[in-house]
């Protein structure tokens, strides 16, 4: 088994109203040093080991997990004992 | 003209859509559960209603875009037959790649539910031929993720091909170029966030949406008469 961690973030330049709200809330708590906040997604998958695992995960990201119009993604693979 | 109104788990404007085309516009219509793909044989127009298909898990419209019925609808669209997606239906069409761009969280984050004024930017389409060019119409909006986004190149293409069909007068959600509705290049697929099906009788506060359904029916009749 492999543990796959997929990180999905909005592309730079894409307006992130959720991030903006978080930034403003942090500032209203007194954290004036927060200049920007961006919100992303974090998805964990347990995947059986097999050939072309990286290609298949890339395909999963492109076809469903991320929307390539507005989002970038990256993933980490690690073994699970 | 026979319409199918596709019902996904979580659709909630399906009956409004059915009522608008059948009871008010006077066309044939059938509610089709998303697994009943064989019921799409012999259907002329597909209507994807608003709501929260699959609970909007992951992203609005993303789960519905992978369903078998969407493969059928892609084939239907490829044949040049009309497809209208409203609200969640529009989100499903962008997630499916049938329309370019994406729908994001509203600029001010809140879910909005009220009437908005729209401008009919193009009345030379299958869906809008009974409107005047630049006619101002009032349709309700009801969405939390209706901010239309696309990259610069896509926007230029939309403009060059007259694919922007409706714009907001007072952009309520932060959409690029005030976009409220777009069509595909071929002109047979329209997606829009505002709800024409909830504006088909004066009782509802506006009947401006009726002309959209009547345009579809009239244009279908014309093309059918030519083909027959």
Swiss-Prot record, chain B:
Domain Glutamine amidotransferase type-1 intervals: 3-226
SMART domains associated with the record: GATase_5
Pathway per the UniProt entry: Purine metabolism; IMP biosynthesis via de novo pathway; 5-amino-1-(5-phospho-D-ribosyl)imidazole from N(2)-formyl-N(1)-(5-phospho-D-ribosyl)glycinamide: step 1/2
Entry-linked Gene3D superfamilies: 3.40.50.880
Annotated active site: 87, 195, 197
Primary residence: cytoplasm
UniProt cross-references to InterPro entries, sorted A to Z: Class_I_gatase-like, PRibForGlyAmidine_synth_PurQ
Pfam families: GATase_5
GO BP term, pick one: 'de novo' IMP biosynthetic process
Location within or outside the cell: Cytoplasm
GO MF annotation: an example: ATP binding
Reaction(s) this enzyme catalyzes, per UniProt: N(2)-formyl-N(1)-(5-phospho-beta-D-ribosyl)glycinamide + L-glutamine + ATP + H2O = 2-formamido-N(1)-(5-O-phospho-beta-D-ribosyl)acetamidine + L-glutamate + ADP + phosphate + H(+); L-glutamine + H2O = L-glutamate + NH4(+)
EC number in record: 6.3.5.3, 3.5.1.2
GO terms under cellular component: cytoplasm
Alphabetic keyword roster: ATP-binding, Cytoplasm, Glutamine amidotransferase, Hydrolase, Ligase, Nucleotide-binding, Purine biosynthesis
PANTHER family in the cross-refs: PHOSPHORIBOSYLFORMYLGLYCINAMIDINE SYNTHASE SUBUNIT PURQ
Function: Part of the phosphoribosylformylglycinamidine synthase complex involved in the purines biosynthetic pathway. Catalyzes the ATP-dependent conversion of formylglycinamide ribonucleotide (FGAR) and glutamine to yield formylglycinamidine ribonucleotide (FGAM) and glutamate. The FGAM synthase complex is composed of three subunits. PurQ produces an ammonia molecule by converting glutamine to glutamate. PurL transfers the ammonia molecule to FGAR to form FGAM in an ATP-dependent manner.
Subunit and partners: Part of the FGAM synthase complex composed of 1 PurL, 1 PurQ and 2 PurS subunits.
This protein's name: Phosphoribosylformylglycinamidine synthase subunit PurQ
Lineage of the species this protein comes from: Bacteria, Bacillati, Bacillota, Bacilli, Bacillales
Gene: purQ
């Amino acid at each position: 088994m492999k543990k796959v961690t997929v990180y999905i973030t909005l592309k730079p330049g894409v307006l992130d109203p959720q991030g903006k709200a978080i930034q403003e809330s942090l500032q209203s708590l007194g954290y004036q040093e927060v200049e920007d906040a961006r919100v992303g997604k974090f998805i964990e998958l347990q995947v059986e080991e097999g050939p072309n695992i990286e290609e298949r995960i890339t395909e999963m990201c492109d076809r469903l997990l991320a929307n390539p119009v507005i989002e970038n993604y990256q993933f980490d693979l690690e073994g699970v004992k | 003209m026979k319409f199918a109104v596709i019902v996904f788990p979580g659709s909630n404007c399906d009956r409004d859509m059915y009522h608008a085309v059948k009871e008010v516009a006077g066309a044939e219509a059938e509610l089709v559960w998303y697994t009943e793909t064989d019921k799409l044989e012999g259907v002329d127009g597909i209507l994807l209603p608003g709501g929260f298909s699959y609970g909007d898990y992951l992203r609005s419209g993303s789960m519905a875009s992978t369903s078998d019925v969407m493969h059928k609808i892609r084939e239907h669209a490829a044949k040049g037959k009309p497809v209208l997606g409203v609200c969640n239906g529009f989100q499903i069409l962008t997630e499916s790649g049938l329309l370019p761009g994406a729908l994001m969280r509203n600029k001010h984050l809140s879910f909005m539910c009220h009437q908005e004024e729209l401008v009919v930017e193009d009345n030379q389409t299958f869906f809008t031929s009974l409107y005047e060019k630049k006619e101002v119409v009032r349709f309700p909006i009801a969405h939390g993720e209706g901010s239309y986004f696309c990259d610069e190149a896509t926007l230029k293409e939309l403009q060059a091909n007259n694919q922007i069909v409706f714009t907001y007068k007072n952009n309520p959600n932060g959409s690029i170029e005030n976009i409220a509705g777009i069509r595909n290049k071929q002109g047979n697929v329209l997606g829009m966030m505002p709800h024409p099906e909830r504006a088909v009788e004066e009782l509802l506060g506006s009947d401006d949406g009726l002309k959209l359904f009547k345009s579809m029916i009239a244009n279908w009749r014309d093309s059918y008469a030519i083909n027959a």
